[in-house]
């Protein structure tokens, strides 16, 4: 029997490139409702929206979602997640899945997969997903986070830079992917053991996390194991810009 899990969807109103992003309309529904709908199709026993904005809270209550108003000063989404887990009274061995509030096309199967992977790997405190990189442009794109794992599927590191750097191949040619190097793109969905979250918050950011702007590096910095599996379904891009929003609107028929 699969271990029960809770989904938390962090949703912030502030966005440099797309203010009010969670409330942007997509085919008659605010984006946050689209994400919530997808999460509810998963096997999660509970789906909760965590927001720092009264407008998002009101919208969620309007379409029937369970939502919490959190503090605004969190350093990262995981810090916000810890507040929610604490307020919900989740047990230390419970599993919580963090689904980003700007992923209206997230496949429910990936939510189930990441939760099941963490349940199946007791040596890890975090589980996440990845997929192959097929284009050299993605490898050199700092907005595409790369991940390298060990033989057991545990993360060695994450980076916005090409990872690994194929020294000899790139000395000859940077217009194509080197043969024999399994480059992988990290997919930003995480499952956590609730007991780990308090440690994560207490540690605070490390210099490596700050340099890359990747909060998962804080966990690796402290020796925490992160299990990384290949996603069973394709993860369509989320919404970061007005252009992304228009693309999703076309997909969903607006």
Curated annotation (Swiss-Prot):
Gene3D superfamilies: Spore Coat Polysaccharide Biosynthesis Protein SpsA, Chain A (3.90.550.10). It catalyses: 3-deoxy-alpha-D-manno-oct-2-ulosonate + CTP = CMP-3-deoxy-beta-D-manno-octulosonate + diphosphate. Keywords: Cytoplasm, Lipopolysaccharide biosynthesis, Nucleotidyltransferase, Transferase. It is an enzyme of class 2 (transferase). GO terms for cellular component: cytosol. One of its GO terms (biological process) is CMP-keto-3-deoxy-D-manno-octulosonic acid biosynthetic process. GO terms for molecular function: 3-deoxy-manno-octulosonate cytidylyltransferase activity. The keyword Lyase does not apply. Activates KDO (a required 8-carbon sugar) for incorporation into bacterial lipopolysaccharide in Gram-negative bacteria. This is 3-deoxy-manno-octulosonate cytidylyltransferase. It comes from Pseudomonas aeruginosa (strain UCBPP-PA14). The gene is kdsB.
